[in-house]
């Protein structure tokens, strides 16, 4: 079997070196005498470094050992620069301490963001790193400020200007091997830390009253509860990391050779070893529960209530206004659908629900929320005239039996539709001749007359009072065109009218339209009359017929004269308008 060329070359080199080894080997030199200098011997080394060096030398082949001895000459007792650089220059305690500090994230340069520093304000920690339009790395606050205002965020708007210098000094103190004390709390300038109170977790009452402990329905989305949990958790993690770093530095510093034991802060280690939960507290009122942490003008951490009070009034909120429980408003959400102002139970056809109390604006509900109020529609439709007044007018209307008989007899031939709304009692009109004729003109019923009864009465109402004894006679007189257009003077109305004249005037005073509907001498009208219903009234009827003819002629003459006067007035008005048109001219 033939060997490869590389293997044969290696074997030849080994044989040559084995034959020439005795000729090359130099005698070992004697160690130099100890000197009075304070420097340690060159070949002396302590700790695991010498052990590692010896292991590496023992692992070398004999040929490499011989080559190493040959490199040393009796006269030159100094090591080569290569070996001098390989020798460690610091103690093992320092080496391990630096690694632990960098691993635990206590140095800002390696704090979870690969040494990122905001190019604008210089901060090293932010929830989100952004980039400026020029490509520089900026923090979340500077990025949002630049996006909103299109200007660089001032460096001292949130933190004092000496923050960067203090961070550098703290980093140098952490790297120094002389001090093994870890920070008790993370460096957050302007923040106040207090021990969390011993309120049992999960004791939040809910219903808009939050104490930050959770446990109630809806606490998963409560900002006050989430804020408290996240802040306390992050502070506890950083505190435990600081305590672990300090405990790891202590035994390693004691193992160092030739070094004095470092000073330890026992109080800080004792406090850090305790399992105490710390939370951020408001600088103004000291509360630890808030849905949003804010900062004042000096950079101090304050709660949401104090921040809003300071922003509104310009002064810090008094401590007496602090409340142990955060009270949230509960807005009344209108019902989904077309009309949110009226509920299904409040339909106009359904009776009003009297058991449900009215929801007025400003009232407090059972769960402690403030009711903003809902405008409810009235169940009954609004009317201009109250129902009781209309009922009183219907009861007090003086309608005679003859008028009612004529009214019912005129509607006997019409078909009856009971379900139709136009035939209801409220929508039907009384006969014209049954209505009472006022002195001048009857005043219409207005809502103002019912709302303010103490107002001054009108002249027509005053004039109606002395003629109350003539109501029975006046309501029988029909409303003719003459009475509407030319009201009679009060002297003629108040004069004495005999019963015979009343009987003569009743059929004659009807208008032609009314006479066509109800004839003057129809059997129904005479049968319904209470005056001429007996056989002994025949002579009176004959005399009344003659008087009626004379009165009708007289009334026709009066009517003719009134129409002539109206025509003359219309002519004058027409002439005045024609003159005005003539003055304006034609186009």
Curated annotation (Swiss-Prot):
It is found in: Nucleus. GO terms for cellular component: nucleus. Induction: The promoter contains a number of GATA sequences; however, expression occurs in a constitutive fashion and is not regulated by the concentration of iron available to the cells. A zinc finger (GATA-type) spans 118-142, 282-306. Disruption phenotype: Derepresses siderophore biosynthesis in high iron concentrations. Residues 466-476, 544-561 have a biased composition (Basic and acidic residues). One of its GO terms (molecular function) is RNA polymerase II cis-regulatory region sequence-specific DNA binding. Residues 204-222 are annotated as: Cystein-rich region (CRR). The keyword Transcription applies. Residues 553-585 form a coiled coil. This is GATA-type transcription factor sre. It comes from Neurospora crassa (strain ATCC 24698 / 74-OR23-1A / CBS 708.71 / DSM 1257 / FGSC 987). The lineage of its organism: Eukaryota, Fungi, Dikarya, Ascomycota, Pezizomycotina. The gene is sre.
């Amino acid at each position: 079997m033939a060997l490869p060329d590389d293997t044969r070359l290696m074997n030849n080199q080994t044989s040559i070196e084995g034959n020439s080894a005795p000729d090359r080997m130099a005698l070992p030199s004697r160690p130099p005498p100890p000197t009075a200098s304070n420097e340690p011997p060159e070949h002396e080394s302590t700790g695991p470094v010498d052990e590692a060096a010896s292991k590496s030398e023992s692992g070398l082949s004999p040929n490499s050992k011989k080559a190493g001895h040959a490199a040393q000459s009796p006269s030159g007792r100094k090591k080569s620069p290569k070996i001098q650089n390989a020798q460690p220059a610091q103690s093992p305690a320092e080496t391990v301490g630096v690694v632990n500090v960098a691993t635990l994230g206590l140095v800002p340069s390696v704090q979870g963001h690969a040494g990122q520093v905001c190019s604008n304000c210089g901060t090293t920690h932010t929830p989100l790193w952004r980039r400026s339009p020029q490509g520089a790395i900026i923090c979340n606050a500077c990025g949002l400020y630049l996006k909103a205002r299109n200007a660089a965020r001032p460096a001292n708007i949130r933190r004092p200007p000496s923050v960067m210098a203090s961070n550098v000094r703290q980093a140098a103190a952490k790297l120094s091997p002389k001090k093994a004390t870890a920070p008790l709390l993370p460096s957050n300038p302007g923040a106040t830390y207090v021990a969390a109170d011993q309120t049992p977790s999960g004791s939040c009452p809910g219903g808009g009253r939050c104490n930050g402990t959770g446990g109630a329905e809806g606490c998963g989305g409560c900002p006050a509860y989430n804020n408290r949990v996240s802040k306390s958790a992050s502070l506890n993690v950083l505190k435990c990391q600081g305590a672990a770093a300090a405990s790891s530095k202590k035994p390693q510093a004691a193992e160092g050779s030739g070094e004095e034991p470092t000073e330890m802060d026992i109080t800080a280690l004792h406090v850090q070893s305790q399992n105490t939960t710390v939370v951020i507290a408001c600088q103004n009122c000291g509360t630890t529960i808030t849905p949003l942490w804010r900062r004042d003008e000096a950079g101090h951490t304050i709660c949401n209530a104090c921040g809003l009070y300071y922003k509104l009034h310009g002064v810090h909120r008094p401590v007496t206004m602090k409340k142990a429980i955060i009270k949230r408003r509960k807005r009344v959400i209108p019902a989904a659908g077309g009309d949110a102002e009226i509920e299904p139970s409040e339909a106009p056809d359904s009776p009003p629900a009297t058991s449900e109390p009215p929801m007025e604006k400003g009232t407090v509900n059972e769960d402690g929320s403030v009711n903003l109020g809902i405008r409810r529609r009235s169940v009954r439709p609004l009317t201009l005239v109250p129902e009781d007044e209309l009922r009183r007018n219907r009861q007090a209307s003086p309608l005679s039996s003859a008028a009612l008989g004529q009214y019912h007899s005129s509607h006997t031939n019409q078909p009856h539709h009971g379900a139709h709304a136009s035939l209801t009692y409220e929508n039907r009109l009384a006969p014209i001749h049954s209505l009472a004729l006022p002195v001048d003109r009857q005043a219409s019923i207005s809502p103002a007359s019912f709302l303010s009864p103490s107002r001054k009465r009108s002249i027509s109402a005053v004039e109606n009072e002395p003629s109350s004894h003539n109501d029975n006679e006046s309501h029988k007189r029909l409303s003719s065109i003459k009475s509407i257009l030319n009201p009679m003077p009060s002297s003629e109305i108040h004069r004495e009218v005999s019963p015979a004249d009343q009987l003569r005037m009743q059929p004659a005073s009807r208008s032609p339209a009314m006479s066509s509907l109800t004839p003057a001498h129809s059997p129904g009208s005479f049968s319904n009359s209470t005056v001429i219903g007996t056989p002994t009234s025949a002579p009176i009827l004959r005399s009344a017929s003659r008087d009626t003819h004379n009165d009708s002629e007289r009334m026709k003459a009066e009517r003719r004269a009134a129409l002539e006067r109206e025509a003359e007035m219309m002519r004058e008005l027409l002439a005045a308008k024609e003159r005005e048109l003539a003055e304006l001219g034609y186009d």
